[in-house]
Amino acid sequence: KLLNELCRTSVKNKNYFAKATFDQVDPSIPYSGIIKAMRFLLGQIILEGPDSLLLWQHKLNDALKTNAHMIIDVIPELDTILHQKKHANQTTPSPSTLTFNLHFQTFIDVFTTNHLPLVLVLDDLQWADIESLSVLDYLLTENKNILIIVAYRENEIHSNLPVFNFISTIIQKICSKTSRQ
């Protein structure tokens, strides 16, 4: 109920809202929760109409340049906005490569601006994959125009899960940043 109210408030304030739940069945799928959240966000943009689509098409093309196909391969809805045809010589690297990570982060950065911060809500963080946690770490440390809300079941967090170290690291970063201010 709280998340639905947050979504309503975000939409009323013209913020973009992306939400997703990580999957317990196969937590090893790279970027699973982040991809679901971005698909949710793109669904909102697609419903806004042709003027908005054109604006986002320009923003995304400017940011991604010739690398949009990497993102389209994992988020096909993006092609509804960009209308790019994949060239025969374009190949998509493994989603775990540094190149893909950088382009994926650039893609997310397009939606986070000073005047319109992105609200990202991720549930069941305990099932997050390493790649998603890497993107979250980047967003938390490098991007100032995003509100990230995560939920997890503390009783399901074990030291062998990737999220265990992630939460500890984020808490340390927050404490360090707070003590410097």
Which residue ranges define each predicted feature?
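Key residue(s) within conserved catalytic/signature motifs
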Residues: 1-181
